[in-house]
Amino acid sequence: MSTIRTVGLVAKYQEPKAAEMVRWLVPWLKQRGKRVLVENGVVRTAAISCTKKEMAAKADLIVSLGGDGTLLNIAPLVERPDVPILGVNLGGLGFITEVAADELESVLTKTLEGDYETEKRMTLEIRVQSKNGKVHRFRVLNDAVIAKGARSRIIDLETYIGDDLLCTYRADGLIISTPTGSTAYSL
C-alpha cells in the first residue's frame, strides 16, 4: 500500500447529499494534509477542479459518492492497480458501493492511516469495430452491452478473445460481463 497524498472526489451530480459531502470532505481532508481533487462541475470548493481522467491519473485514493453507477463511471479510467476506490452509497443501488454515508468519516480515517484492505476486480477491455472499420475501445468493470441499432432487427457478430476468434453469430445483441457485473442480470 502506498502513502495517500492526493484524494480524488467524484460524485453523482444530481444528488444534493453528494455535494454536501464534498463540501464537508474538502476541508476535512485538507486538515489532514491531503491534496484534494474534485471532478469538474460537482461543486465549487477550495479543491483543485479536474476531469475524471486527470483525477484517475493523479489521485492516490478516489472516493466515489453516489451509487454503483458513479463508481462504475470512474473505475475504468483508473489504470494504476495500486489506486483504491472507496465507494460510498448515498441511497441508490449499492452492491459495490459498500460504505454507508454515516460510516464515511471512520472508514476514511482508517483508510488514510493505511488500515484498509483492497479487493481486486477484473476489468475487460472491449474493442468494437464497425462495418466502416472504425474501432471504439472501452474498459469496463461491470459489463459491456453491444446492441442492434434502432433500424436493425439483427446484427452479425464476430467475437474474439485477444486475437483468437471465439465464434461468429447473428443476434440482436451481446452482453459481456465480468464477475462483478454478472450478478446484475440475476436481479
Residue ranges and their predicted role:
Residues 21-23, 75-78, 98-100, 187:
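Short amphipathic alpha-helical segments
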Residues 93-172:
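Catalytic core of DAGKc-family lipid kinases
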Residues 59-62, 68-69, 78:
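Feature detects long, helix-prone N-terminal segments enriched in hydrophobes
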Residues 73, 77-91:
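Gly/Ser-rich helix-loop-strand patches that form or flank binding pockets
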Residues 39, 65, 86-88:
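Generic beta-sheet signal
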Residues 173-178:
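AMP-binding/adenylate-forming core of the ANL superfamily
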Residues 18, 69-74, 183-187:
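Short glycine/serine/threonine-rich phosphate/pyrophosphate-binding segments
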Residues 1-61, 102-117, 128-138:
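ATP/NTP phosphate-donor binding region
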